[in-house]
Amino acid sequence: MIDVIIRHQASPLIESALVYQSITIIFGNAHLQSSFRKRNVILAAMMRTRIPGLVPRICQTPLPWKRPTQMTRVRYARWSTSHAVTWLETGHIDLKENEGLLFINNIFPSRLQWLLRGPLGGMRSYEAAVKRIDRPHLAASDTFQIIQRVVPKNLNVQVKEVVPRFREGGAFVKYTRPGDVNDADIEASIKENLKEHPIRPWFNPFQEVQVCRVIGRPWIEDLYRLPSPRLKVSFHPVSPEASAADLNTETLYTLFRPYGKIRDIETQPSDGKVTPRYAYVEFSRPKYAGMAKNCMHGFTIPEQEGGGKSGTRLKIKYERKIKLSMIKDWLLNHPRIVIPVLAALLAAITVTIFDPMRTFFIELKIKSTLQTEENGVMQWIRKQVNKANIIYFGRKGADPRGLTAIWEDRQEDITRLQSWLMENVETFIIIHGPRGSGKRELVLDRALVDYKYKIVIDCKQIQDARGDSAKIARAASQVGYRPVFSWMNSISSFIDLAAQGMIGTKAGFSETLDAQLSNIWQNTATALKKVTLEHRKKNDNDSHLTDEEYLEAHPELRPVVVIDNYLHNASESSVVYDKITEWAAGLTAGNIAHVIFLTTDVSYAKPLSKALPNSVFRTITLGDCSLEVGRKFVMSHLAYESKDGKTQPRRAEELEDLDACIEALGGRVTDLEFMAHRIEAGETPRGAVNRIIEQSASEILKMFLLTPETIEQSWTHEQAWYLIKRLAESKDGSLSYNEIVLSELFKENGEITLRALEHAELISIAAVNGCPQRIRPGKPVLRAVFKKVTENKALSSRMDLAIIAKKINKENKSIEKYEEELSLLGSLPRQPRELTDRIQWLLNKVYSSQNKIAKYEKESAYLQKILRSEH
């Protein structure tokens, strides 16, 4: 019958193997062994060749069959899932009568689990890895070989189940014993066997395998709880109605010392409110703590051993020591301390690592021009290119813009500026003049053309940038400050906002525009000082001087910082200009560099005086050139283009209106240059001037008359039109400053409005001894522009109507105020004699205002009639 079963099951190989194995284990006699030996070899060979991936290594062997031992049966049952499901689902190992439980440690490499499986892997992947790396033929390498060697052969026990605890490096071994043998004797025999025959696993040859009897009811769980040498022992009552005892240190020491060296025992304070009561037991090694936890968890201490009247049950779990995870928890739980400290560390790292790099790049920016000019290879290449250009294109003049006439007229200013740079005067140099007067060209192309070290900062680019990040990036690019993480400022602001919500105050991660600009200018000052001192030698005549004394003694060696467009689009509280002025004052006072300000704003003295209050500034004012110089400039420009071969020389009759056109344009360099370009393009001087006037008229209409008014605007359309009309009608092209301030449209904040219009370059204010005296057009050509704008009758009538409407509205408000006071005086029961003059004055005011209204209405009617007649 057994043969029939085997033959019937031989087709599916795996089922045949299982039936064969089961029958062999159940009927393990000699007849069956000899009957199935040949079938076993053939069946194993077929299973290896057909389905090797599904057959365990134990079956893939050519060796003859041997009767399975008890430990072999343990091996087969060990990797099955039926037992695992049982104790994982219940959390406990059920023990029947005559059954016991041992815990064996140091049989799994708990320290090397990260090599065997991922952090999210389960127990199954770990078992598979152990199967792959275990080598049964090596001593103490197979975990089941270790278990077999732990239990003495002469000990009459049968191993029923092995429950691994991979994280703790051990396993529970469930066994059955005869009725006349107790668990304590079995434990003693096993320990004696290990003492005589110690076992050292392959992964830890310096420590031995240890075994202890489980006297509690261990909790088998697969939670993510890592072993620790520190245990938390909680004292629970046996039943809900009973009470647990608070074990003292001596009792705990007696209970836990057999499992290993104890480092410390810490009991709960007597006044502690936490229940159940607990104590901390810290072992010297984690394996001792694992042994104690697995053997003592669930153990009930009887009354005679200090467990109280009804006994005390121990519940044990690992208490994690202060390691990285606890440091992380502490950091997360104390943001008021951590966030400011992180901000300080970040600032320290920035200063230590990035600031030297930034200073180095600024030095490269300062010396970039000089390095190119002094490089012999670059000089040779430049010379060869110039020779080739002369051969191919012909020799060109040295002044392509024809500015020689301008520089000859301003040679005195150039010489004065160069002499100031050789003097040791701790003050600013200011070059003031209207836009287009040639300030930048005079400084950079003439006065500083042969100067070694110079750096130019254009305030217009910084001030016109939108947002703090853009301003920081522009300022950094001006001086070569890199690396700059301007985009991090926005992210840091969000972090600061979140920190403010958590701790109530800002953490300081984000730096304000003020702080960022301070860092940029401070690094620039450091680079300027290094550049000046790098050529100083130890054996020169000034070697005995300190760096500060050396800088003071050699003003000719200092770099020059040119700050262009100073006070462009400035407001009352501009951080950009405040930091630049403060930094420039430090450069000047410390003899680090000469500072030259180029500005069109006449109020430059106010912010600069705050930075250097006790200094007298060196000032050069550039105005419009004279008629003679303007003619020379235009003619030299045209002569250069003729020599270049691009245009033919103009005949004298074609330039007969040149003087009149130059007089109409005035001496503004940019306007004269534009006219010269138009003449080169084939236009007559008069046509070029008309084109300039038309373009300027369009700009005036757009900026001051037709664009809707904004809150930031400090003037009204009516005020701008009033000045345009008055300047167009004036004989000498100027108005009295005091007369305009006292006019009806400028009585309220008149001076502020005039300064704003001057800043917008509609007008210019001429001062005598520091006091405003005359009002003129912003540039000479604007006088002709104003005349052209006022020739538009429709526009003129509409703007005059707006002015008259404002005047009528103002007089009506005055009459309302006078009438309110008259009504108040009329409500008195009797009229005192002292009020007669006041009443008469009010009546006269009402009469005067009413006459003005009547006059304005007549003018308004006339203007409306003109406006209706225009098509």
Swiss-Prot record:
Q: How does it sit in the membrane?
A: Single-pass membrane protein
Q: Does the keyword Transcription apply?
A: no
Keywords, comma-separated and alphabetical: Membrane, Mitochondrion, Mitochondrion inner membrane, mRNA processing, RNA-binding, Transit peptide, Transmembrane, Transmembrane helix
GO molecular function, a single term:
RNA binding
What InterPro entries is this protein classified in?
Answer: Mt_escape_2_C, Nucleotide-bd_a/b_plait_sf, RBD_domain_sf, RRM_dom, Yme2_C
Stretches assigned to the Mitochondrial intermembrane side: 358-871
A GO cellular component annotation here is: mitochondrial inner membrane
Disulfide bond residue pairs: none
Query: Does Chloroplast show up as a keyword for this record?
Result: no
**TM regions (residue ranges):** 337-357
Please name one Pfam family that this protein belongs to.
Answer: RRM_1
As for subcellular location, the record says: Mitochondrion inner membrane
GO BP terms, alphabetized:
mitochondrial genome maintenance; mRNA processing
Q: Which residues form the RRM domain?
A: 229-321
Q: Which family does it belong to?
A: Belongs to the YME2 family.
* UniProt protein name: Mitochondrial escape protein 2
* Species of the source: Aspergillus fumigatus (strain ATCC MYA-4609 / CBS 101355 / FGSC A1100 / Af293) (Neosartorya fumigata)
